Amino acid sequence: MVNPYTEVADGNKRIRTFDSSVDATELVWHRDRKTRQVKVLESAGWRFQYDNKIPTELNTGDVLRIEKETYHRVIAGSGRLVIEITEYED
């Protein structure tokens, strides 16, 4: 499966960019092996959802901590989503 984003890595940080034209079926529920901090660098109507929770809007400057093995997903908005991901060793 091809990732629904482009990514640039720099040490333990990665910049991911999602385009608004991404197919919604590619934005799947998933969980990560490591705890992550996600900083929103750019968002236009994108939302974030934890399993069994109501989606919340992602705004530029928001910082999320996603614990390892926690199901979550993003929901496409009207423009790009650009995030900075920092992974932590648990």
What are the language-model segments listed below?
Residues 39-41, 57, 65, 75:
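Well-ordered beta-strand positions
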Residues 51-69:
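Short acidic-glycine-tyrosine-enriched beta hairpin
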